[in-house]
Amino acid sequence: MRFLSTRRKHPAAKPLTLLLALFMMGAVYSVVSPAEQSAADTNTNPQVVQGKGLYDVTCSSCHGLNGEGTSQAPSLIGVGAAAVDFQMGTRRMPLSKPMAQAPRDAAPEYTQEEIDAIAAYVATLGKGPAVPAESKYSPAGLSEEEIARGGELFRTNCSACHNIEGRGGALPSGAYAPSLTNVSSKHIYEALRTGPQQMPVFNEGALPDQDVKEIIAYLAEMREQPQHGGLELGGLGPVSEGFYGWILGIGGLVLVAMWLAKKGARAR
């Protein structure tokens, strides 16, 4: 104790104490300043400011004032700008009321500028997938072999839910896998990377961009296939032809077989 008392009386004690205090303040600031800088960027970026205003009006009642989520909707922290661009670009969001699945083209239409602004704001809440550049999803220039490989990838990873030709199908609990017939290449890419609703996330480790391009090219080729009329049954053939083939054709053969059996029994 006498040693410490002697040290406190040393002429260098006060300057050293001051330096130690300044060092501690610097360490605390280095931890806090990134968050403060992020908040400052949010407050000064015009697009983010616009997006925050739109978010407060259209999204916060379900997703929370800070995107933290509520009992009605999930958190948006870390979903990224791509999720916003997909959900609002396909008019699945904002929902007017909770339901098992957000249907396409059910929400009010927003301009791309408004969608970009909300996406920019949501991107500040946490790191997530960004809106992709066209080079990431454009299938232009792919060979026939690459398109055929896209079909194999689609059948392996997607057809169990979306049907072999991307026509969609039913899922448990009132949900469904939507048709991919008229979905843009960008939105297909964003859906794979963000996993909307019941869909799993396919990150670049699971499906590299080249694989995604090949899948998109395969779906584009399916859309260009000629249609020969009739009510189609998910690419399995027109319903009308199937009806005649199975019900009338096979049914007729069964009736003929029964008639022949009865005729043979009478002859005996």
Regions found by a protein language model. Give the residues of each.
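Electrostatic cytochrome c docking/interface patches
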Residues: 29-53, 70, 127-153, 173
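Short hydrophobic alpha-helical membrane-anchoring segments
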Residues: 26-34, 258-263
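N-terminal export and membrane-targeting signals
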Residues: 3-18, 47, 242-248
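Hydrophobic membrane-insertion alpha-helices, especially the h-region
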Residues: 14-31, 252-253
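Long, compositionally biased, intrinsically disordered
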Residues: 1-6, 23, 27
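Gly/Gly-Pro-rich "capping" loops immediately C-terminal to redox-active cysteine motifs
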Residues: 48-52, 64-108, 151, 163-205
